[in-house]
Amino acid sequence: MARSVWKGPFVDAYVLRKAEKARESGKSDVIKIWSRRSTILPQFVGLTFGVYNGQKHIPVSVTEEMIGQKFGEYSPTRTYYGHAADKKAKRK
């Protein structure tokens, strides 16, 4: 079920504070965040966030198309290695 419109988008308070501080300083450093559940807002465009995937921070450069999505969508938590090959089929 989607979030109701009257509530507005959810963003952790510390993410807003870090983004505001980065905007004021003008530095282009990676902003490390652990909040994968936070929504990407228009004021985040142009900033680079390091989104934690459980092991390391994946750098995510925010663009216009990402607005309204969640940070977690751009930092995969699982590695796909492909399906195991059929050993019987290889021998023939």
Swiss-Prot record:
Q: State the InterPro entries in the record.
A: Ribosomal_uS19 (IPR002222), Ribosomal_uS19_bac-type (IPR005732), Ribosomal_uS19_CS (IPR020934), Ribosomal_uS19_SF (IPR023575)
Query: Does RNA-binding appear among the keywords?
Result: yes
What GO CC terms are in its UniProt record? cytoplasm; small ribosomal subunit
Q: Say yes or no: keyword Nuclease present.
A: no
Q: Which GO MF terms does the UniProt record name? A: rRNA binding; structural constituent of ribosome
Instruction: Tell me the keywords, alphabetical order.
Output: Ribonucleoprotein, Ribosomal protein, RNA-binding, rRNA-binding
Q: Kindly name one Pfam family recorded for this protein.
A: Ribosomal_S19
A Gene Ontology biological process noted in the UniProt record is: translation
Q: Please give the function described in this protein's UniProt entry.
A: Protein S19 forms a complex with S13 that binds strongly to the 16S ribosomal RNA.
Q: NCBIfam families attached here?
A: rpsS_bact
Which family is this sequence assigned to?
Belongs to the universal ribosomal protein uS19 family.
Protein name (Swiss-Prot/TrEMBL) = Small ribosomal subunit protein uS19
Organism encoding this protein? Paracoccus denitrificans (strain Pd 1222)
